[in-house]
C-alpha cells in the first residue's frame, strides 16, 4: 500500500495505526483521516520524533499493510 491508498482505506487501517502508535488519540486519528502527512505530524507531536523519523514510520506502516 502506498500513501495515497492509505486515505482510501483509512477505515480499515485506523485500528492498526492506533495499535502501532498507542499515544495517538481517537481525536488525533479523526484529524488524520488517512492523510499520511497528517499522520506523520501527529506521530512527531506525540512521540517527539523528527519529521523524517515520523515519515519513515508512516512509509513502513504503509508497506506492511497489505491491501
Residue ranges and their predicted role:
Residues 1-67:
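Intrinsically disordered, low-complexity, hydrophilic segments
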